[in-house]
Amino acid sequence: MEARAIAKYMRISPRKVRLVAENIKGKPVEEALNILKFTPKKGAEMLSKVLYSAVANAEQIPGVDVDSLCVDIVKVDEGPTWKRIQPRAMGRAYRIRKRTSHITVVVKEM
């Protein structure tokens, strides 16, 4: 059986989350959580929250052994971009793009 968790509109660039997401793909859940715990990136904290949620969702399925779960799919998609204006000198303005991410984690039994 598999369980999934999705976090939408996370306020971090997908490019930054994908750096961390590649490290946990295919790993057992305990090992993946340890990797995320000791990775000094903002994306690691967000991924660990989604991974904990996926494990909690798997616990709700009858007959699933939580200790034998492994990370099957980690998908980071681009969400909508928030446009903001940064005032500059001499009446100019620069556009700031605040990027968002949709993070999907799927865990399954080994």
Curated annotation (Swiss-Prot):
One of its GO terms (cellular component) is cytosolic large ribosomal subunit. GO terms for molecular function: rRNA binding; structural constituent of ribosome. The keyword RNA-binding applies. One of its GO terms (biological process) is translation. The keyword Ribosomal protein applies. InterPro entries: Ribosomal_uL22, Ribosomal_uL22_bac/chlpt-type, Ribosomal_uL22_bac/org-type, Ribosomal_uL22_CS, Ribosomal_uL22_sf. Keywords: Ribonucleoprotein, Ribosomal protein, RNA-binding, rRNA-binding. This protein binds specifically to 23S rRNA; its binding is stimulated by other ribosomal proteins, e.g. L4, L17, and L20. It is important during the early stages of 50S assembly. It makes multiple contacts with different domains of the 23S rRNA in the assembled 50S subunit and ribosome. The globular domain of the protein is located near the polypeptide exit tunnel on the outside of the subunit, while an extended beta-hairpin is found that lines the wall of the exit tunnel in the center of the 70S ribosome. Belongs to the universal ribosomal protein uL22 family. Part of the 50S ribosomal subunit. This is Large ribosomal subunit protein uL22. It comes from Maridesulfovibrio salexigens (strain ATCC 14822 / DSM 2638 / NCIMB 8403 / VKM B-1763) (Desulfovibrio salexigens).
